[in-house]
Each structure stands twice: as structure tokens, then as C-alpha cells.
């Protein structure tokens, strides 16, 4: 059985790992970049083609394809080099209809991303076959539907909150905690699944954890206080009523604050043990979150105050931000931003209007690092809530698993 490279404080160092087949056939394990990938329908091997890409693509499906996040999944997968979109699925009222008849397209660019005539399927593994399933379902239906796909052999990359805090489910930001994919062997063994579930965090947590990771790695975190100013797109379409949000700030988003406070610690924690003995250990610092809704279309802006070990200076914190090397460096992941964290020198940045679309919406932009008389350091962080915080995050998770050769056991 293959193991992991040792991890640093709270598991934030990048890791090399392989997950063996469930039957323990170590001879089938793949350990080098030149090795093949398991096929997607029958056990033969699809070898890498020119440029290191495999000659066959993994079959992908989108659950909840008619919603705003589902549409972003469709647009991202439309021309993906490694994944082929073969099925769109939604609720019973949409199943059986052409995609263009099941929903209105709410994104820029080509309407329905070329899939307008595809027939929408039911959210059931009996309705279609897919190697990868990208879930934009709400949490309640996700709790029943996602395990059905995982049990049948699909790998589910979920934007839903249903399984994020489960002990055997990775809550992944590829740049920060790629080693957490190692929990999948335990997940599959204990649940008896042929496939698996991998989750991405809440859209606010993605921004916060990405900003905190360099500080945890460089200094260690003692406490965090955060206030979010969250875009209306985070409420879905049609979202918050214009009568409620225009010229207003709504100081409450249901269930948002507990999600942020619990998820960040899991992401910044570490994976202990190997194989079926692996367990996730959360980072042990207190985090207080206040989440608000503001009249911005896209982009969550956070004000963050943090107490760090050793009381580093502003210059040292800025150096930690600028010097952060993500786990994904050198992997060539299709959806990875050219620059994951960018620290702005402008006193009035980041701004959603000017910064949120950077690197296809996958960049986290930081700014205004300064002393905090209460906590020690404070700064601003910004990220795209429906790309970096939703569809783009799940697709990037799948690309990481693919690059790390974790997807060898898909059917």
C-alpha cells in the first residue's frame, strides 16, 4: 500500500499519494506520471496521448444542471480537455425536456454552451452512466442522491453541504490540502461504495481558508474574526428580491456562519494515518464569522482579523502571502489559476467590480494588510463565489484527483 509524504504543520504541505484498488491489488496501482489510467468502461488501459493527456476522456454528468451553479458546471465542462459532458440531470419537472426548454440560460456567452438540445435526465444512476458526477444539488436532495451515484461507481464532486463535515469525506481546496484525498480509501471501504464523494467548501469558506493557509503555514494561527459581504448570486437565481437588497445590507444568511466556522478548520487541518486507518484532524484555532448579503452581483469580500503566533509584522505577513506555493504548482491543472493568491498594492483594492473575474474567477485577491489593534493583523480578501466558490472549485477538485491518479477505479 502506498503512503503519503510527511505533512507539515496542520497538514498543509503538498503530498504524493496513491490509492490502491479496493481489492488490495497493489500490482494494479499506478505510481508514475507515465503510467496509464484505468478505462472508463471495462478494465483496459487508456494510455496518455500527446502532451501527457489521455486519449480517452472521462464521462461527466451534472446534477442540478438547470440552476445557476449547474449552468456554470456545463459551461466549464463544454470544452474540457479531459472530461466529456455526457448527461445533464435535474428534478422531475425538468427531466425529459430539452435543456433549453427546462431552464433559462443566465450566463454570458453561448446560450446552453452547445447543449441546448440535450435531453435532461432524472437524478438517478439508473438514468445514465458517468465516471464523474458534478453535483449542484441542494443539500437535502444531495444527501440521498449523491450516495446512490457513489455506490454505483461514479465519483461525485459535490458543491452541496450535505457531506462536507463527514469524517471520511474530503473537504478540498486543491491548492491547500491535496493530501486529504487520501481519506477516500477509508470512505470506500467503510461505506462499501464502488465510487466516492469529494466535496468543496462553502463559497465564503473558500476565500477565507485560502487567505489563512499561508499564515497558518508560516506562523500558526491563534484566532480569527471575519465579516463577509456576500454577493446576491450566492442565493441562487432569481436570488434576493430587489426590494430587499437594493440600497441595503442584510445582516443574516441562514446557516452560513456555522458552515464557515466549522469548514475552515477541517480544510486547514491534517490527515493522520494511512489507508483505512486515515483520519482527519481539524486545525485548533477559534474562528468567529459574521456573514452579510450586499447588493453586488458576483464576488464575496471578507474583512479578516487574525492573531498569529510570534506577532509577525505587516511586511512578514505580506511576504507569506506572496511566497505561498500551492499544492497544485507544476500539475498543469486545466482550471487552476495562473496566480492563486495575489496581494494588491492599491489601497482601494480588492474590489468585486475590478478583481473578481481575474484568472477566470479562480483567483483569490488580497489587499490592505495592516496592523490590527485587537488581533494583530487585518486584511481584505475577495473571491468569485459561483466559480472559485462553487462550479470551478468542484471541477478543479476533479482535475486534481485525475492528476494524482486517484480516479483509476471509476467504471
Feature roles, as predicted:
Residues 2-252, 282-286, 358, 364-365, ...:
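N-terminal Rossmann-like NAD(P) cofactor-binding subdomain of oxidoreductases
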Residues 232-411:
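Charged docking surfaces used in two-component/phosphorelay signaling
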Amino acid at each position: 500500500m502506498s503512503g503519503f509524504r510527511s505533512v507539515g504543520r496542520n497538514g498543509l504541505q503538498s503530498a504524493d499519494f496513491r490509492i490502491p484498488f479496493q481489492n488490495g491489488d497493489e500490482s494494479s496501482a499506478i505510481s508514475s506520471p507515465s503510467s496509464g489510467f484505468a478505462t472508463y468502461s471495462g478494465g483496459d488501459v487508456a494510455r496518455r496521448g500527446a502532451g501527457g493527456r489521455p486519449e480517452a476522456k472521462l464521462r461527466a454528468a451534472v446534477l442540478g444542471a438547470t440552476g445557476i451553479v449547474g449552468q456554470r458546471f456545463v459551461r466549464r465542462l463544454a470544452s474540457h480537455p479531459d472530461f466529456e459532458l455526457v448527461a445533464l440531470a435535474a428534478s422531475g419537472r425538468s427531466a425529459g425536456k430539452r435543456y433549453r426548454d427546462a431552464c433559462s440560460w443566465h450566463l454570458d456567452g453561448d446560450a446552453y454552451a452547445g447543449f441546448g438540445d440535450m435531453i435532461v435526465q432524472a437524478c438517478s444512476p439508473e438514468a445514465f452512466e458517468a465516471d464523474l458526477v458534478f453535483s449542484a444539488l441542494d443539500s437535502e436532495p444531495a444527501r440521498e442522491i449523491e450516495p446512490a451515484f457513489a455506490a454505483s461507481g461514479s465519483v461525485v464532486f459535490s458543491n452541496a453541504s450535505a457531506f462536507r463535515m463527514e469524517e471520511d469525506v474530503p473537504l478540498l481546496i486543491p491548492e491547500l490540502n491535496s493530501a486529504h484525498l487520501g481519506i477516500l480509501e477509508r470512505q470506500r471501504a467503510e461505506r462499501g461504495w464502488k465510487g466516492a464523494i469529494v466535496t468543496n467548501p462553502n463559497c465564503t469558506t473558500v476565500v477565507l481558508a485560502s487567505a489563512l493557509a499561508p499564515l497558518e503555514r508560516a506562523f500558526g494561527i491563534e484566532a480569527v474574526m471575519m465579516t463577509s459581504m456576500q454577493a446576491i448570486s450566492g442565493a441562487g437565481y432569481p436570488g434576493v428580491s430587489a426590494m430587499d437588497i437594493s440600497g441595503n445590507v442584510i445582516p443574516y444568511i441562514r446557516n452560513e456562519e456555522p458552515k464557515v466556522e466549522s469548514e475552515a478548520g477541517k480544510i486547514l487541518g491534517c490527515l493522520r494515518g494511512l489507508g483505512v486507518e486515515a483520519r482527519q484532524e481539524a486545525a485548533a484555532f477559534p474562528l468567529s464569522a459574521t456573514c452579510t448579503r450586499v447588493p453586488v452581483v458576483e464576488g464575496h469580500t471578507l474583512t479578516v482579523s487574525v492573531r498569529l503566533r510570534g506577532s509577525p509584522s505587516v511586511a512578514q505577513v505580506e511576504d507569506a502571502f506572496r511566497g505561498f506555493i500551492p499544492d497544485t504548482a507544476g500539475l498543469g491543472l486545466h482550471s487552476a489559476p495562473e496566480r492563486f493568491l495575489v496581494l494588491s498594492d492599491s489601497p482601494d483594492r480588492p474590489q468585486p467590480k475590478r478583481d473578481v473575474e481575474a484568472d477566470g474567477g479562480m483567483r483569490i485577491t488580497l489587499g490592505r494588510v495592516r496592523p490590527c489593534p485587537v488581533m494583530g493583523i487585518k486584511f481584505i480578501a475577495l473571491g468569485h463565489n459561483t466559480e472559485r466558490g462553487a462550479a470551478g472549485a468542484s471541477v478543479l477538485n476533479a482535475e486534481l484527483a485525475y492528476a494524482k491518479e486517484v480516479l483509476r477505479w471509476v467504471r
